[in-house]
């Protein structure tokens, strides 16, 4: 079973929830709303601060969310959760990441890329960031960045339908390293090659990154076979840490 989480404190999440329940029939089952293999939970508070313990109940969960961008990037995104480095201003804990969901998160983004044919939105990964704390594999799906986008019918159908029908493929999973928040080179490599992506360590987290956090990213990317590294978008100290870790653990290192 899978779990979808929506928040009434998030206007985009509310619109995604409305689309979800209008298109797909959910009925109460065991105290939660259910449609096939999906349960649905609606919370009142902000999801990034809503820690949940669900071990043994679901194989993964996905949170429906708005995306905020100071640069007003209009986007449809999927990303893992947690915090690399010492800050946890948006939920979770410092230097703590959740278990990523490479097969399903990648399958969701793959479906979004396949189904969206417009030019208004960028369909992309985001690097690992923000809370909350979960104890099962999880990912976020987001619409950015203003009310106009949160109400866009094509944005709603692309994101929600892709959550319900991800294009899941049994490809090897990799940790992404480098690039900015949207990891553009990693996204393009993903688009053109047979891989799944788990955690992504943005260059913005590289200055304070500890070597053991690389180990954590691998161990919290199920089935991880190695790294896909944006060489120019990775700081020199992190390039060396990743190379050393890959060599010592017989992991693949793909440099792009």
Swiss-Prot record:
Q: Superkingdom of this entry's organism?
A: Archaea
GO terms, biological process: D-amino acid catabolic process
Gene3D superfamilies documented for this protein: AF0625-like
* EC number of this enzyme: 3.1.1.96
- One short Pfam name that applies is tRNA_deacylase
Recorded GO molecular functions are: D-aminoacyl-tRNA deacylase activity; zinc ion binding
Task: Identify the cofactor(s).
Answer: Zn(2+)
The free-text cofactor remark is: Binds 2 Zn(2+) ions per subunit.
Q: Which reaction(s) are listed as its catalytic activity?
A: a D-aminoacyl-tRNA + H2O = a tRNA + a D-alpha-amino acid + H(+); glycyl-tRNA(Ala) + H2O = tRNA(Ala) + glycine + H(+)
Q: Where are the transmembrane segments?
A: none
EC top class, as a word: hydrolase
How would you summarize the oligomeric state and partners of this protein? Monomer.
Tell me its family. Answer: Belongs to the DtdA deacylase family.
| PANTHER family named in the record | D-AMINOACYL-TRNA DEACYLASE (PTHR34667:SF1)
Its recorded name reads D-aminoacyl-tRNA deacylase
To which species is this protein native?
A: Thermoplasma acidophilum (strain ATCC 25905 / DSM 1728 / JCM 9062 / NBRC 15155 / AMRC-C165)
